[in-house]
Amino acid sequence: YEGTYPLPEAQLDRFLLKVLIDYPDTQFEAWIVKAVASKAGGSGLSAGDVQQVCTPEDILNAQAEAAAVQAVEPVVDYAVNLVRATRQHSAISLGAGTRGAISLVRVAKSYALLEGRGYITPSDVKRAVLPVLRHRVQLSPEIAITGQTVDDMLNAVVRTVEAPRG
């Protein structure tokens, strides 16, 4: 569901990720319903239960650490080639732009940092493809009516672009 007014492609491209979030499991959904329905008015959930887990400085430091993760030229080229392949794939009517490649590398750096590495790998880039590119490409109408998804086509693109070795 896109909401009342879908965003234009130029605005969608400015979002770093599109993460798909599913419904909660039955037990958690029941807990939510009970918590909210037991209160008169409002959401029924107390903001007082929220605890700070990091400071703004922590976030800035993490961003700086992620930016410092090394991205060697062959892996950056791989990210660029993946994005360029979205523009050439027959099932995709609108491919990703340069921001998509930049975002692939940035998210790959974050993945590497979270795994304790100071460098990105082609696997980090592959892992980033779906959340980074799924909102940046559009399927051709002929493919969209077949029930295939953007994720299906992005996975097909990944299979066609050779990853660097070594």
Predicted regions and their residues:
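C-terminal engagement/docking regions of AAA+ P-loop ATPases
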Residues: D77, T86-G166
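Hydrophobic aliphatic residues
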Residues: Q11, V33-A37, V83, V129, ...
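Conserved AAA+ ATPase small/helical "lid" subdomain
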Residues: G44-A101
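Short, surface-exposed, polar/charged, turn-prone segments marking secondary-structure boundaries
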Residues: K18-P24, S46-V50, N81, G147, ...
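An amphipathic alpha-helix signature
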Residues: T26, A30-K34, V76, V80, ...
